[in-house]
């Protein structure tokens, strides 16, 4: 069995998550792989989560915060350069989740931090959570990835997660928040580089003690890797694609209601694969044509404020006599989507 160590110099989350998939799907069946990486400001959601439930999409767009959807399950997390992320990839027959946690705990001990496992997924120092993990398994391989809070901006956890309730009745997984702490609270000198070095050392030591050897070099990955590895570029394009980040959202219903001076609008949008598949509007408005036009305009549109605004603008041009009412509905719906 061989050891492989990769470290990303790129902070684009789509690149790093694509690298995970690339390694996972091209894994040498005779190797244990460690991948270390960190992201610029990003909300990463689990494979089965709804970004409109978990995130403040509009604020993220305004602040140039990435949205990424990972292949594995679990809850929504906020990443910035104060997070260090680790991924262990192994052949399924030789996968040892306990060993992975042991390596991280041993690395933290090298830095004077006593951590332990909390439940199945988390690590903590005292009663403070400092790491969460998620897992993925196929017939012949497994991976375990997690985040270590080094010096993350805790304020921004609240800035981009947990939006204003929109009456979204989602079928996906709702994240559970926990008390968390940064590792710098326990060692003020720790940073991404010192932690990465400690994890690499602990990884080599663990497998040296089990006769795998400790000579694995560190492979540095950067943007040039996309050009050198066509398969990696393919995974990158998928991670960056709107249809993956939004379109893979579980089915949900958005129900909102308001009163305009021309009537009540009770709007129900059934959203599947991030597109509005069914529109139901109850209204006491006198103009029945307006209600029919609104339903027709929203049907099969992406659940995206820019696409919805474009459809309403198109409807305005086609029916200028209804412009005031159309504008009312457009501003209201988009405002509700923004939270």
UniProtKB/Swiss-Prot annotation:
Alphabetically ordered keywords of this record: ATP-binding, Cytoplasm, Ligase, Nucleotide-binding
Residues bound to (R)-lipoate: 129
Any one GO molecular-function label of the UniProt entry: ATP binding
Record EC number: 6.3.1.20
Residue numbers binding ATP: 70, 75-78, 129
Pathway assigned in UniProt: Protein modification; protein lipoylation via exogenous pathway; protein N(6)-(lipoyl)lysine from lipoate: step 1/2; Protein modification; protein lipoylation via exogenous pathway; protein N(6)-(lipoyl)lysine from lipoate: step 2/2
Cellular compartment(s): Cytoplasm
Major subcellular site: cytoplasm
Sequence ranges assigned to domain BPL/LPL catalytic in this UniProt record: 28-211
GO CC aspect terms: cytoplasm
InterPro entries: aa-tRNA-synth_II/BPL/LPL (IPR045864), BPL_LPL_catalytic (IPR004143), Lipoate_ligase_A (IPR023741), Lipoate_protein_ligase_C (IPR019491), LipoylTrfase_LipoateP_Ligase (IPR004562)
HAMAP family: LplA
Subunit structure of this chain's protein: Monomer.
Name by which UniProt lists this protein: Lipoate-protein ligase A
UniProt organism field: Psychrobacter cryohalolentis (strain ATCC BAA-1226 / DSM 17306 / VKM B-2378 / K5)
Gene name as annotated: lplA
């Amino acid at each position: 069995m061989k050891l492989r160590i990769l470290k990303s110099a790129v902070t684009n989350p789509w690149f790093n998550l694509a690298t995970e998939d690339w390694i996972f799907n091209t894994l040498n069946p005779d190797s244990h792989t460690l991948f270390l990486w960190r992201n610029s400001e990003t909300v990463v959601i689990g494979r089965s989560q709804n970004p409109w439930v978990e995130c403040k999409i509009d604020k993220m767009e305004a602040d140039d915060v990435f949205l990424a959807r990972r292949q594995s399950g679990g809850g929504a997390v906020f990443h910035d350069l104060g997070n260090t992320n680790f991924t262990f990839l192994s052949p399924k027959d030789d996968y040892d989740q306990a060993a992975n946690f042991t390596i991280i705990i041993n690395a933290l001990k090298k830095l004077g931090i006593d951590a332990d496992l909390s439940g199945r997924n988390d690590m903590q120092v005292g009663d403070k959570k400092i790491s969460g993990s998620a897992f993925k398994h196929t017939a012949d391989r497994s991976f375990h990835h997690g985040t270590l809070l080094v010096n993350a901006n805790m304020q921004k956890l609240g800035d981009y997660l947990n939006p204003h309730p929109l009456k979204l009745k989602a079928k996906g997984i709702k994240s559970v928040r926990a008390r968390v702490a940064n590792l710098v609270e326990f060692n003020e000198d720790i940073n991404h580089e010192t932690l990465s070095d400690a994890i690499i050392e602990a990884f080599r030591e663990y497998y040296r003690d089990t006769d795998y050897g400790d000579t694995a070099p560190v492979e540095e990955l950067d943007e040039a890797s996309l050009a050198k590895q066509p398969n990696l570029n393919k995974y990158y394009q998928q991670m960056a694609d709107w249809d993956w980040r939004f379109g893979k959202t579980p089915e949900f219903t958005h129900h909102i209601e308001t009163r305009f001076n021309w009537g009540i609008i009770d709007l129900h949008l059934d959203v599947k694969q991030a597109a509005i598949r069914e529109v139901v509007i109850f209204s006491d408005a006198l103009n029945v044509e307006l209600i029919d036009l609104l339903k027709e305009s929203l049907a099969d549109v992406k659940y995206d404020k820019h696409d919805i605004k474009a459809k309403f603008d198109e409807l305005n041009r086609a029916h200028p006599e209804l412009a005031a009412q159309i504008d009312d509905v457009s501003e209201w719906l988009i405002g509700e989507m923004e939270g």
